[in-house]
Amino acid sequence: MKVIKNKKILKDFILFTVLPFVIPFIVEIPEQLINVRVKWLFIVLIAIFDFYFAYKSLIIKEKNNNREYIQQSIRYSYSGAHEIIERKRDTLSHETEFNMIDVKNNMLPYDIHFHISDICKEFKKVISSITKINNEYITTAFIYRYVYEGCSEKDSQWKRIGGIEPISKCELNNFVKKEDTTYYHIINNNIHYIFGDSKEELAKQGYYHLSGRDEMYNNVGSVFSIKLAFGNNATTFVEGIITVTTHGKFFTENMDIDNASSVLRNMIIDEIFPYYRKLIETELGLLYIRHISK
């Protein structure tokens, strides 16, 4: 690695220092020693050579920056997931220490809703870190419902866990039926996720319902909403949707990389969210088990 780095330093030194430094000396060579046309041909060739490899070097640098950004973001994701597991372990340890576990009355010795909310908050922190947007401009919301065979109408209603995302003064189960919401499209149109760097553009396409809070920020912001579920190979027992929104800030406004929106979308879906998906789906499974055991 050190040898490669030293070669790169030497290459950049030649391209950006030596070659430009040589050109003025070529210009000063007397015509008696070198033909004028040959002299200018050398200068043009050196300039073309320098420009070409300088451009190529910048392209490589941009790719390396993108790669480094993705790797750093994945580290943020892994670190956040690790902290969630540690907090859950500490909660169990604390409750056993003070004899707070009563399996007869509660088969699970911790608050599942609180833990799912904690996972959502940690995911929000990761989004904040990789987009460089302060936490106060980001909100997360998580909703879920039971969909197992034979569940009652009450159980099949959507419920919210944590999150402070305003629902435009509309009751949740009425809100998800609005055709201009991300929830509606994910629930009814078999769309796995919705990602938009501009809420306003999504709203124009009928995929996002602008809220009162959005209007406070002139409808500036981004949204990411994705579906999760717990079940077995035969059926699904419970499903949920996590939504991350920004207010007054776009996901990519602080990202100085090419195709920032596509890079961020693919990175969240393929590299970052899978950590949190497994954590949340596990808790949804425990939520279902506790529910049917009552």
List where the protein language model places each region.
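Short, flexible/disordered intra-domain loops and linkers
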Residues: 3-4, 107, 254-259
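Helix-to-coil/beta transition segments that act as allosteric "coupling" elements at the rims
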Residues: 206-236
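Intrinsically disordered, low-complexity terminal regulatory regions
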Residues: 38, 45, 49-161, 290-294
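Juxtadomain coupling helices with adjacent low-complexity linkers
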Residues: 238-294
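Short, flexible loop/turn elements at secondary-structure junctions
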Residues: 145-147, 230-232, 246-248
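Regulatory sensory and allosteric helical modules in signal-transduction proteins
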Residues: 145-218
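Hydrophobic, helix-forming membrane-interacting segments
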Residues: 1-64
